[in-house]
Amino acid sequence: MGVGNEQFLRAMIPHHSGAILMCRQAAITDDEIVKLCRQIEKSQQAEIDQMKAILASY
């Protein structure tokens, strides 16, 4: 049986949060990776906000 809408969102929020946390805690010195992490933080946070809004509508 597949994962439903709500279960999917509830699993993805911590997954995205983990990516943000890894970027913030990593000892990154490569400028390209630093830039990538900034993009990851911005996009993943926006997606977390969107998923929370969708969950709130259920």
Regions picked out by a protein language model, each given a short descriptive name:
Residues 1-58:
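His/Met- and acidic-residue-enriched segments that coordinate or traffic transition-metal cofactors
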